[in-house]
A protein has these predicted regions:
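A short, N-terminal "cap"/entry segment at the start of jelly-roll beta-barrel domains
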Residues: 1-41
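Conserved hydrophobic/aromatic beta-strand scaffold that supports enzyme active sites
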Residues: 5, 44-46, 64, 89
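Short, charged/polar surface micro-motifs in flexible loops or helix N-caps
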Residues: 38-40, 49-54, 71, 116-117
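Short, conserved beta-strand element in jelly-roll/cupin
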Residues: 49, 58-74
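Short histidine-centered beta-strand/loop micro-motifs
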Residues: 55-59, 76, 82-83, 101-102
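Short acidic-glycine-tyrosine-enriched beta hairpin
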Residues: 78-94
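Ligand-binding loop in jelly-roll beta-barrel domains
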Residues: 94-117
Length: 117
């Protein structure tokens, strides 16, 4: 068995993330790390949303998100709605349509099973 070294990125939360390029929505998303296994790809990084228009996102992959700063208001098409604060963890199944909003700003760390950005 070949030993592989782990990866480390100091203060990754401070990296400037690329815009999601959704007109009228102040949202940024970037992959910090991408796994090497192409068959079971995992991408992890940060998502930032600022006050303004809501972001509606259709998931075609599984994702977990942990709120690391600020407060998200998150809802789905089933009528479920939560106010997620620092330390809260969310799971978005493939096929879900999620609406993200915030009264000020929020940052989440995500880990998703999808193709890299």
């Amino acid at each position: 068995m070949t030993t592989k070294a782990f990866k480390y990125k100091k203060q990754a939360i401070k990296d400037q993330q690329p815009s999601m390029n959704v007109p009228g929505v102040a949202a940024w998303l970037g992959d910090t790390f991408i796994s090497a296994d192409a068959d079971k790809r995992i991408c992890a990084g940060f998502f930032r949303l600022e006050k303004g228009n809501k972001l509606v996102y259709d998931y075609d992959y599984e994702e977990m998100k942990c709120v690391v700063d600020g407060t998200f208001i998150i809802s789905d098409e089933t009528g479920q709605k939560v106010t997620a604060t620092v330390g809260d963890v969310l799971y978005f199944p493939s096929g879900s349509r999620i609406t993200f909003e915030t009264a000020d700003y929020a940052v989440g760390f995500f880990c998703g099973q999808r193709v890299p950005l």
